[in-house]
């Protein structure tokens, strides 16, 4: 995403500092209108994209036009499933990490939690306790579990989603209010 190019650049730097061939990996920061020329280049054999449905449709069309392999991971709604034989403590720990990884601002962060009835009450009780104990703060402070969202508009959008969900019948188990500060 355009607001987090540093991750790709850091991956490229690390790979270039290693023993791997220097041309093995490239981070290319371009606008959507530049992607067709890149995908159509004879040296490009395939393309991957993790992103929105609209970005995937554009990249998929361009890859098909150039007859290139494409792998698209779009608009994920990643499920986290807890079955009756699960170790609840492990499930709670893993679930918390899966939801909060990179502040939840990654397409692979768990978003749907499916829990069988037989362990639901215990799982819900423990996961609520875990999230209540999660400390938001400065990401450089080791005592913080999560930092702020990447952009203010994302914070507003997330709060609107919560309000819409409540209006449609959802209940809030933890939080639900926008924290003070930036």
Where are these regions (language model features)?
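Short beta->alpha connector loops at strand-helix junctions that form conserved
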Residues: 1, 29, 50, 83-84
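Conserved small-residue-rich beta-alpha loop and adjacent elements
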Residues: 1-23, 67, 89
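Short alpha-helical
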Residues: 3-6, 32-34, 53-55, 65
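A general structural signal for stabilizing positions within well-ordered secondary structure
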Residues: 16-19, 38, 61, 104
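Conserved functional loop/turn residues at catalytic and ligand-binding sites
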Residues: 19, 42-43, 169
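ALDH superfamily catalytic-core signature
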Residues: 24, 46, 52-182
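A structured beta-alpha segment of the ubiquitous adenosine-cofactor-binding alpha/beta core
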Residues: 26-45
């Amino acid at each position: 995403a355009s607001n987090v190019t540093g991750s790709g650049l850091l991956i490229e730097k690390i790979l270039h500092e290693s023993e791997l061939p220097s041309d093995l990996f490239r981070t290319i920061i371009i606008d959507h209108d530049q992607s067709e020329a890149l995908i159509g280049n004879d040296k490009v054999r395939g393309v991957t994209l993790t992103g929105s449905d609209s970005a995937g449709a554009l990249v998929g069309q361009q890859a098909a036009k150039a007859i290139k392999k494409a792998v698209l991971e779009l608009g994920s709604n990643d499920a986290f499933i807890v079955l009756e034989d699960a170790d609840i403590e492990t499930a709670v720990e893993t679930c918390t990490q899966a939801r909060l990884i990179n502040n939840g601002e990654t397409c692979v962060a768990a978003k749907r939690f499916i829990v069988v009835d037989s362990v639901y009450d215990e799982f819900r009780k423990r996961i609520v306790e875990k999230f209540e104990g999660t400390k938001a703060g400065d990401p450089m402070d080791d005592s913080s579990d999560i930092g702020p969202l990447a952009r203010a508009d994302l914070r507003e959008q997330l709060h609107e989603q919560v309000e819409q969900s409540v209006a449609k019948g959802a209940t809030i188990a933890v939080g639900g209010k926008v924290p003070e500060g930036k």
